[in-house]
From Swiss-Prot:
Lineage, broadest ranks: Eukaryota, Viridiplantae, Streptophyta, Embryophyta, Tracheophyta
Name by which UniProt lists this protein: Maturase K
Gene: matK
GO biological process, one term: tRNA processing
Presence of the UniProt keyword Plastid in the record: yes
Pfam families for this protein: Intron_maturas2, MatK_N
Length: 503
């Protein structure tokens, strides 16, 4: 990585980066996969012992420019071994290289802007669970929420124009545009092709999508500061996660050139809160639905006139928080009213006082989670555990370690659930699926294999939180009930579990 950064430092004096030559450096693809140069996960199923080298990249670029993707047919793909059978494989290599190369100048520019403006990094924002602590603190005092799916560009050139601000190298942009045009049909063809494109090119797609989302989020801190004239509590989050200060002067010019200052009075709301993960965001407010409708109209006009994205206003619903649940990051979150009756007596008069308190609840939706287990072949459609024949060739320790790791990761991620009974069912499915896989490997019945393993095997499926807490606190009934059933937000989770990502 030092060599990569040193290469970019050589060209910083010219105020742009020459990224095109980096496509022919082998260490770029080693960085992309976190593997050595002699081994790559891309070629596990390949018939030949190929390596990601500059020769392969040169061949791919040459064939891409020679072929016309608009007249490329299925018959040609069968006849052309390189651009047919190996097209997806080589394109996956190139997409990984693109992702690493294009990410680097943006990261360096962001770090340079932090050093210049002396903005301190907020390391506590790296955990996904910090979002739920924010929701617990803020959403219990709010009344209305809009849960919105972010629209995506309908034309590729709009996305390419967005990238021109970040990447100044014309050669890299031209090749990237050509590469995207070759695969753009995957977005307008059936769903299976889209799924293949996303799975085959995850890093490049995430970078392109996040660059698209950042264009929306630039505007929110600026609008909030301009409209409410109060210090924005969320500006520090945006300043770290996106590059707000880089484009603030540009957006000031855009808004005042287009007479946007005349509608800023609609948005004077110091209680507006915004949170986003992946392709969904929620906007919540304490005021009346009238203000939420004004925000709704503004967002639709912003997407249509400034980002050329068509979006139907009817798809943005305004709901009361006390009557609505938000499906967010593998949780079903809601604000519930808990009533508590207090008995008060003064002299001979007896009064009952009913106190209503808001509580932020996070529940694990068991049906989608079991659906994820079904897709991963841990159970059938009814939730009954099944064995995994593909794992029978592994050793017993590897099979047990894999199931334990999945079980602990799921339990660790969903430790903030206010109702953990559904997690016990997930543990049961994973535990019995592990036993059935081992019994199938040794050609024995499940009953005899469980007797052979004993109760010690079942105790291994305790979560890490239960093991640590059992060593610190006594296992009394009151302590166990308070600790194991309470919400535990772990601030070391940087990515959502694959099984929990069923949205």
């Amino acid at each position: 990585m030092e060599e990569f950064q040193g290469y970019l430092e050589l060209d910083r004096s010219r105020x742009h980066y020459l990224l095109y030559p980096l496509l022919f450096r082998e260490y770029i693809y080693a960085l992309a996969h976190d593997h050595g140069l002699n081994r790559s996960m891309l070629f596990e199923n390949a018939x030949d012992d190929x390596k990601s080298s500059s020769i392969i990249v040169k061949r791919l670029i040459t064939r891409m420019y020679q072929q016309n993707p608009l007249i490329f047919s299925a018959k040609d793909s069968i006849q052309n071994q390189f651009f047919g059978h190996n097209k997806n494989l080589y394109s996956q290599i190139l997409s990984e290289g693109f992702a690493v190369i294009v990410e680097x100048p943006i990261s360096l520019r962001f770090l340079f802007s932090l050093e210049r403006k002396e903005i301190a990094k907020s390391y506590n924002l790296r955990s996904i669970h910090s979002i739920f602590s924010f929701l617990e603190d803020k959403f219990t005092h709010l009344d209305y929420v809009s849960d919105v799916l972010i629209p995506y560009h309908i034309h590729l050139e709009i996305l390419x124009q967005t990238l021109r601000y970040w990447v100044k190298d014309a050669s890299s942009l031209h090749l990237l545009r050509f590469f995207l045009h070759d695969y753009w049909n995957s977005f307008i063809t059936p769903k299976k092709h889209i799924t293949f494109f996303l799975k085959g090119n995850p890093r490049l797609f995430l970078f392109l999508y996040n660059s698209h989302i950042c264009e929306y989020e630039y505007i929110f801190p600026f609008l909030r500061n301009q409209s409410s004239h109060l210090r924005s509590t969320s500006s520090g989050i945006f300043x770290e996660r996106i590059y707000f200060y880089v484009k603030i002067e540009h957006f000031v010019k855009v808004f005042f050139d287009n007479n946007f200052q005349c509608i800023l009075w609609f948005l004077k709301d110091p209680f507006m809160h915004y949170v986003r993960y992946q392709a969904k965001f929620x906007v919540a407010s304490k005021d009346t639905p009238l203000l939420m409708n004004k925000w709704k109209c503004y967002l639709v006009n912003l997407w249509q006139y400034h980002f050329s994205v068509w979006f139907q206003p009817g798809r943005i619903d305004i709901n009361q928080l006390c009557k609505y649940s938000i499906y967010f990051l593998g949780y079903r979150s809601s604000v519930r009213l808990n009533s508590s009756v207090v008995r008060s007596q003064m002299l001979e008069n007896l009064x009952l006082i009913n106190n209503a308190m808001k509580k932020f609840e996070t529940i694990v939706p068991i049906i989608p989670l079991i659906g994820s287990l079904y897709k991963s072949n841990f159970c059938n459609t009814f939730g009954h555990p099944i064995s995994q024949p593909t794992r029978t060739h592994s050793s017993d320790s590897d099979i047990i370690d894999r199931f334990l790791r999945i079980c602990r990761n799921l339990s660790h991620y969903h430790s903030g659930s206010s109702k953990k009974k559904s997690l016990y069912r997930v543990k049961y499915i994973l535990r019995l699926s592990c036993v059935k896989t081992l019994a199938r490997k040794h050609k024995r019945t499940v009953r005899t294999f469980v007797k052979r393993l004993g109760s010690e095997f079942l105790e291994e499926f305790l979560t890490e939180e239960e093991v640590v807490l059992s060593l610190i606190f006594p296992r009394t009934y009151s302590t166990s009930r308070r600790l194991y059933r309470g919400q535990i937000w772990x601030l070391d989770i940087t990515s959502i579990n694959d099984l929990a990502n069923y949205e």
